[in-house]
Amino acid sequence: MAKHKHEEHPEDVEVKETVETAEQAESASPEKSELELANERADDFENKYLRAHAEMQNIQRRANEERQLLQRYRSQDLAKAILPSLDNLERALAVEGLTDDVKKGLEMVQESLVHALKEEGIEEIPADGEFDHNYHMAIQTVPADDEHPADTIAQVFQKGYKLHDRILRPAMVVVYN
């Protein structure tokens, strides 16, 4: 029996070695996991920083685009308010019986208004030729004939205007149908 007490079983040796390697792994593992955690946190912070930086650039870009858009269309409301006055000037010029001086004065006012509008990018919409529903509003139709094909403009009731690529007011027209 004494012999058995001093002998170690091979199974016990394996168990002791396994316990020792597990203890070594545990002591080495916390260091490695702390390093891994620190690296993960650093990667996470870097990712958050990059996302925040990209978001800030997007905000700045959108603000810049909005500022440019506001600058481009800043005169839209003023133009819409002035267009009826321009229409009234055209009607006044169409009245017969005006003296030459009055007519010349009205034409000068009209020209200065049109020039000021052009400087702001406001242009009259051409209303001759073919009807385009993007720029013209048909308020009446008349029958087409040999001289006047369908979908062409017969008469302009009110001029249309656009500011760069925006329609301020479509031209009101009579269309051959």
UniProtKB/Swiss-Prot annotation:
Q: CDD domains from the entry?
A: GrpE
Region: Disordered, residue numbers: 1-41
Q: Which GO terms describe its biological process?
A: protein folding
Keywords of this protein's UniProt record, alphabetized? Answer: Chaperone, Cytoplasm, Stress response
What SUPFAM superfamilies would the database entry show?
Coiled-coil domain of nucleotide exchange factor GrpE (SSF58014), Head domain of nucleotide exchange factor GrpE (SSF51064)
Record's GO cellular component terms: cytoplasm
Q: Which domain of life is it from?
A: Bacteria
A Gene Ontology molecular-function term?
A: protein homodimerization activity
- Main localization, broad class: cytoplasm
Q: Where is the composition biased (Basic and acidic residues)?
A: 1-19, 29-41
Q: Where in the cell is it found?
A: Cytoplasm
Q: Which family does it belong to?
A: Belongs to the GrpE family.
* Function of the protein: Participates actively in the response to hyperosmotic and heat shock by preventing the aggregation of stress-denatured proteins, in association with DnaK and GrpE. It is the nucleotide exchange factor for DnaK and may function as a thermosensor. Unfolded proteins bind initially to DnaJ; upon interaction with the DnaJ-bound protein, DnaK hydrolyzes its bound ATP, resulting in the formation of a stable complex. GrpE releases ADP from DnaK; ATP binding to DnaK triggers the release of the substrate protein, thus completing the reaction cycle.
The protein's matches in PANTHER family, at most eight in alphabetical order, are given as: GRPE PROTEIN (PTHR21237), GRPE PROTEIN HOMOLOG, MITOCHONDRIAL (PTHR21237:SF23)
Q: How does it assemble?
A: Homodimer.
User: What protein name does the entry list?
Assistant: Protein GrpE
Q: Supply the source organism's classification.
A: Bacteria, Bacillati, Bacillota, Bacilli, Lactobacillales
Q: Which gene encodes it?
A: grpE
